[in-house]
Amino acid sequence: ARYTLERTHRTAETLPWLAEFRGRSIDPETGAERIPWDYKPRLWQGHPLLYDVNHWTEDELFRVGTVDAIWHETQAGMDALLARYGMTREGHLYRCENNQPDTIVLFCHFGIMMACIGHLLGVSPMLLWHGFCTQPSSVTTLVTEERVKGEVVFRCMQSGDLSHLYAADEPYSTAALFPECYTGRDSTDPPEWDALGYR
């Protein structure tokens, strides 16, 4: 965020809950702690609860660990942020007596971003974490819709936009992707990152 803030002569507020999603669970194959967006498909796709935004953290994969606590922290943090703009969550929508076309810009990592989007759109983060990829420096845009006075919902306009890199003829990172075809290595990150503890 610093580069953008310096270039645009703006300041920002750091929101502790908006740090990368810190929830961890225990991988049933290895017994090691694992981030929830890094499970192999065969380990989670047969779990119906993981598709349910209201109950996904109750699944056996997350009964041990901190995923549920961090999910609730994320929801509370997002709702508190939106409350500053007059929005109060009610079920899956927000009540707002005076909705404004303000722009809120959040700089964050993939895991927490998808958790926030899941909360706003009513989608289990497991589906977003394992079905979407947003590379570093990409832009994701959500807008509000108020079709009934005082009832606000969110819609994703774009996810992972990299047009600023294309326009500047800059390459994009493949971080966060897994190999398109099997390679024997479960990552597209540079092999030297393994020794640095990035995996």
Regions flagged by a language model, labelled:
Residues 1-58, 199:
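Phosphate-coordination/substrate-recognition cap region in phosphate-metabolizing enzymes
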Residues 3-7, 81, 119:
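Alpha-helical structural signal in soluble globular domains
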Residues 21-39, 93-103, 115-199:
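Acidic, low-complexity terminal tails and accessory targeting/binding regions
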Residues 40-73, 182-186:
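Short glycine/proline- and acidic residue-enriched helix-loop micro-motifs
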Residues 60-93:
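Internal catalytic-core helix/loop-beta-alpha segment
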Residues 109:
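Short, conserved phosphate/pyrophosphate- and ester-handling motifs at nucleotide-, phospho-/glycolipid
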